[in-house]
Amino acid sequence: MKLNLANPIVFFDLETTGINIAKDRIVEISVLKVYPNGKEEQKTIRVNPGMHIPEEASAIHGIYDEDVKDAPMFKHIARELAHYIEGCDLGGYNSNRFDIPLLAEEFLRAEVDFDMSKRKFVDVQTIFHKMEQRTLSAAYHFYCDKCLSLIHI
C-alpha cells in the first residue's frame, strides 16, 4: 500500500462487548500499521473484557466468553499497545465516533496516558459518506454495479 504519509498510521478495528463507550469493553483489537516507507505490520490481540460478552455482541463478531477466558485484560496490554501506536495517526471505519473514544476510555481505565492532541484521525466512513451520494440510485449503483432508472408515472 503506497500512501503519502508524514507519520505511520495505524488502521484498527475493535470488537467489543457492546456499543456503550462508557460501559462496554474491548474483546479484540486488530491493527494494520503502515509506515511512510510502505512497510506494513499486522496484529490481532484477543482481550479478556472482565465481564460477560452478551450473546448479541457474540452473534456479530463470533467471540464468546470461552474464547477470551485466558486472554490478558486490557490493563495488562495497555502500556505495550500505547507504545506501539505512539507517534502514529489513527484510522478506521466509524473510528472517530466509536473505536477511538472507546480505546481512549480503555486507556483511561488502565491509567495509561494516551495523548490524542498530536495525531490525525482518518475515518473511512466519513470519507465514504462525503464521496458517495446518499440516494437509492447511488446505493444501487455502488452495491450492484448497475444503473437504476426511476420512472415516475
Regions picked out by a protein language model, each given a short descriptive name:
Residues 1-118, 133-147:
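Conserved non-catalytic scaffold segment of RNase H-like nuclease domains
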Residues 121-135:
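Short alpha-helix plus adjacent loop in nuclease-associated cores
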